[in-house]
UniProtKB/Swiss-Prot annotation:
It catalyses: L-lysine + 2-oxoglutarate = (S)-2-amino-6-oxohexanoate + L-glutamate. Its EC number is 2.6.1.36. The keyword Cell inner membrane does not apply. The modification N6-(pyridoxal phosphate)lysine is found at K300. InterPro entries: Aminotrans_3, L-lysine_6-transaminase, PyrdxlP-dep_Trfase, PyrdxlP-dep_Trfase_major, PyrdxlP-dep_Trfase_small. 2-oxoglutarate binds at R168, Q274, R423. It holds the Pfam family Aminotran_3. This is L-lysine-epsilon aminotransferase. GO terms for biological process: antibiotic biosynthetic process; gamma-aminobutyric acid catabolic process.
């Protein structure tokens, strides 16, 4: 005899008005005070499900939404939505169980974003873990080249820059140094850190100071290599530092660091988690700087994070890309994210979107430079590459106040960076009209700063 059990009653979830209260019972809720309407929001416009207020999104979920929210290439294609839903029903372990969507994603990624000199791909969830696995690849490479045993590998080091943000995982915690609250009281490695010679703009005005900053940084790098006595596995840098202040570096400085790595038999590793996937107007920022990295960490806009590898990695035949389980994870990324990323990359390719990024980026940068001219001594250091643009304000307090006024008074969301930087991270599809609204909000917020 089979007993029929009454169906369990599933309690109704919270409605929009209760979201923050429901979350606050269990998680920290110190983010934006809007409740995102996942249906009404579209493109660069985020809608508050409680008030109906529309916000201009110039932060794109911390530079992770390449086409904004609910892009038409996805939501207006019912067949593709079905394909995406089918991929979301299950979560297979991609490194060991293979599917057509996985293969389609990998081939699309290689075609749209790939570098022939970096043929190896590794996928994982999270930008910090992308960097983490790039470091593991570098440690493994260096250890094999030197013939180090398990005890000796503990002497290996990572040369890196001040004001870096590379994540909050194990190895990366020793490299991130933007905000002490993110790294304090966690055990860290004492790895060599050199000054970050961020370019001051306009470049013509600050040429001598910029050259001197680069000279000091290169001297510090030379000394770090000397002191490490051959134990530096790699140099790791963001080609443009994001959270640390939207700090740009000259091609000459980065090329000099690359040359130092070659001379001292260390890998040259770039973190393009924020700057990659078209934000600067090319697939990767390093392509505009004359660089040939050995490893590149990626994430955010790519939807699936990971590492591209090549270059001198091939000097060691049994590198981590060739040996089973040297680097891996259960899921190796997320299949649903891969399906979404495939459509995003196809759209970037089909629409020649990166050409538009170059044009819109110049438009935004010109607007920021005009604001700097109108507010001398207040708005300074207008800078950008593609849509990765920023300005500086006099101090942290004034910067934060301007951002608050942009948000509360003009419904525009931008981001802080460094101690006094204000950065824009719009979707790649942003229009000149939308950039105008953002620039006008910044101008009005500056005018009302008191």
């Amino acid at each position: 005899m089979v007993l029929e059990m009454p169906a369990a009653r599933v309690p109704a979830g919270p409605d929009a008005r209760d979201v923050r209260q429901a979350l606050a019972r269990h998680v920290l809720t110190d983010g934006y005070d809007l409740v995102l309407d996942l249906e009404a929001s579209a493109g660069p416009w985020l809608v508050d499900a409680v008030t109906g207020t529309r916000y201009l999104d110039l932060f794109s979920f911390f530079a992770s939404a390449p086409l904004g929210i609910n892009p038409s290439c996805i939501v207006d294609d019912p067949a593709f939505v079905g394909e995406l839903a089918a991929a979301a029903v299950n979560k297979p372990s991609n490194p060991d169980v293979y599917t057509v969507p996985y293969a389609k994603f990998v081939t699309t990624f290689a075609r749209v974003l790939g570098d022939p000199l970096l043929p190896h791909l590794f996928f994982v969830d999270g930008g910090a873990l992308a960097v983490e696995n790039a470091l593991k690849a570098a440690f493994d490479w260096k250890a094999q080249k030197l013939g180090l045993d398990d005890r000796a590998v503990n002497r290996l080091q990572v040369l890196h820059l001040e004001r870096s943000f590379h994540g909050r995982s194990g190895y990366t915690m020793s490299l991130t140094n933007t905000d002490p609250s993110k790294t304090a009281r966690y055990p860290k490695f004492d790895w060599p850190r050199i000054p970050a010679p961020a370019l001051e703009h306009p470049l013509t005005t600050h040429a001598e100071a910029n050259r001197e900053a680069e000279r000091r940084a290169l001297e510090a790098a030379e000394e770090a290599f000397r002191a490490a006595d051959g134990m530096i596995a790699c140099f790791l840098a963001e080609p443009i530092q994001g959270e640390g202040g939207d700090n740009h570096f000259s091609a000459e400085f980065l090329q000099a660091m690359q040359d130092l790595c070659h001379r001292h038999d260390a890998l040259f590793v770039l973190d393009e988690v924020q700057s990659g996937c078209g934000l600067t107007g090319t697939a990767w920022a390093y392509q505009q700087l004359g660089l040939r990295p050995d490893l590149v960490a990626f994430g955010k806009k790519t939807q699936v994070c990971g590492v591209m590898g090549g270059g001198r990695i091939g000097e060691v035949e049994s590198n981590v890309f060739a040996v089973s389980s040297r680097i891996s994870s259960t899921w190796g990324g997320n299949l649903a994210d891969m399906v979404r990323a495939t459509r995003v990359l196809e759209t970037i390719e089909r629409t020649d979107l990166l050409d538009s990024v170059v044009q819109r980026g110049k438009y935004l940068r010109d607007g920021l430079e005009a604001l700097a001219e109108r507010h001398p001594g207040v708005v300074t250091n207008a800078r950008g590459r593609g849509l990765m643009c920023a300005v500086d304000l006099p101090d942290t307090e004034q910067r934060d106040a301007v951002l608050r006024r942009m948000y509360t008074g003009h419904q525009v969301i931008a981001l802080p960076c460094g101690t006094r930087g204000l950065r824009f991270r719009p979707p790649l599809t942003v229009t000149e009209s939308e950039l105008d609204q953002g620039l006008e909000a910044l101008a009005a917020s500056l005018a009302s700063r008191g």
